[in-house]
């Protein structure tokens, strides 16, 4: 007869319907929800949610699911469990899977006292939200400018796009300094690369996106002068770009250059008259300018108002 043998533990019963992905049944997998696209590459940085469980325990001993935005982890560097590395390499974007890791692929014969007992098989539920393959980008950026010039333009554009994707991820995590570094790497690649006239528009389009990212990032870093610089570079490429005009307006407002801020924001509003952010920024500008003029009037009033004490002295 089929079915589980009497006396088997929950993990033993579960293991019978799981796929062996290590070849020695040290890492077993059960797909809960299928993913899509390519498998995770060996040098990828992954964005995952995970929870680790001991047998007979309902609460996880380890989990990152409480974080609003999990941090990006690079395979081979940031992940300490061999079983998790192997498991992730079998996954696709959007996949949710359950894994059993034998001690060899988890915490070994000693365990991790007092949390993990010796020789313990652990269960992990892992959801692969996304992954970015930085190996190609890292290798390319390490080359000299002369070596990079030997590659076709599409290669440069792909690497620059990867750097920008990393920057976007770091920006969403509010790691603005790290995001800036990635964006600058992308921009340097695009600045160094010459293209034939018929393909120059591809380079300019890629530059525009990165310049807008840099302008916004420097606003977040509270460096409006630099934000304005990158915004104006974006306007050289596309002088009517509403987002570039908006960023320049924001930067000028922070610098208390109210007339310049108004000029940029009015142009942005002409391009996108129903844009909520632009209209709100114009209201903010009006409020800031009113406060500024009120303070100026008050200061002038104090400077030129007659002094009662002096008047009294003059009368004596």
Curated annotation (Swiss-Prot):
- PROSITE patterns for this protein: FKBP_PPIASE (PS50059), TPR_REGION (PS50293)
Q: Which GO terms describe its biological process?
A: cell differentiation; meiotic cell cycle; piRNA processing; protein folding; regulatory ncRNA-mediated gene silencing; spermatogenesis; transposable element silencing by piRNA-mediated DNA methylation
Recorded protein name is: Inactive peptidyl-prolyl cis-trans isomerase FKBP6
Subcellular location, record wording: Cytoplasm, Cytosol; Nucleus
Q: In which tissues is it expressed?
A: Specifically expressed in testis and sperm.
Similarity section:
Belongs to the FKBP6 family.
Task: Supply one GO molecular-function term.
Answer: Hsp90 protein binding
Q: Where are the TPR repeats?
A: 160-193, 208-241, 242-275
- Gene name as annotated: FKBP6
Function statement: Co-chaperone required during spermatogenesis to repress transposable elements and prevent their mobilization, which is essential for the germline integrity. Acts via the piRNA metabolic process, which mediates the repression of transposable elements during meiosis by forming complexes composed of piRNAs and Piwi proteins and govern the methylation and subsequent repression of transposons. Acts as a co-chaperone via its interaction with HSP90 and is required for the piRNA amplification process, the secondary piRNA biogenesis.
* SMART domains named in the record: TPR
Gene source species? Equus caballus (Horse)
Instruction: Describe the subunit structure.
Output: Interacts with HSP72/HSPA2 and CLTC. Interacts with GAPDH; leading to inhibit GAPDH catalytic activity. Interacts (via TPR repeats) with HSP90.
InterPro entries on file:
FKBP6/shu, PPIase_dom_sf, PPIase_FKBP_dom, TPR-like_helical_dom_sf, TPR_rpt
Domain of life assignment: Eukaryota
- Give the disease association: Defects in FKBP6 may be a cause of stallion sterility due to defects in acrosomal reaction. Disease susceptibility is associated with variants affecting the gene represented in this entry.
């Amino acid at each position: 007869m089929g079915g589980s043998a009497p006396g088997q533990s929950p993990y033993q019963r579960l293991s019978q319907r799981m796929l062996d992905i290590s070849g020695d049944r040290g890492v077993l997998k059960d797909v809960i929800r299928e993913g899509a696209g390519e498998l995770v590459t060996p040098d990828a940085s992954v964005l995952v949610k995970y929870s680790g469980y001991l047998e007979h325990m309902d609460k996880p001993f380890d989990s990152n699911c409480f974080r609003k935005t999990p941090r990006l982890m690079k395979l081979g560097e940031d992940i300490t469990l061999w079983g998790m590395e192997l498991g992730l390499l079998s996954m696709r974007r959007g996949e949710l899977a359950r894994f059993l890791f034998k001690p060899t692929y988890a915490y070994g014969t000693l365990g991790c006292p007092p949390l993990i007992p010796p020789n313990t098989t652990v269960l992990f539920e892992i959801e692969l939200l996304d992954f970015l393959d930085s190996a190609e980008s890292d290798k390319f950026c390490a080359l000299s400018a002369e070596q990079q010039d030997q590659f076709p333009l599409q290669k440069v554009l792909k690497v620059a796009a990867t750097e920008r994707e990393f920057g976007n991820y770091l920006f969403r995590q509010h790691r603005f300094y790290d995001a800036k570094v990635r964006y600058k790497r992308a921009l340097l690649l695009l600045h160094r690369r010459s293209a034939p006239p018929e393909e120059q528009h591809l380079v300019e389009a890629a530059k525009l996106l990165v310049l807008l990212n840099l302008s916004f990032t420097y606003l977040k870093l509270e460096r409006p002068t630099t934000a304005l610089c990158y915004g104006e570079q974006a306007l050289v490429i596309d002088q009517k770009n509403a987002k570039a005009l908006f960023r320049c307006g924001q930067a000028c407002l922070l610098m208390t250059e109210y007339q310049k801020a108004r000029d940029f924001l009015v142009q942005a509003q002409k391009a996108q008259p129903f844009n909520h952010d632009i209209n709100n920024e114009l209201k903010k500008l009006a409020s800031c300018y009113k406060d500024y003029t009120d303070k100026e009037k008050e200061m002038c009033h104090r400077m030129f108002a007659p002094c009662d004490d002096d008047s009294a002295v003059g009368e004596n």
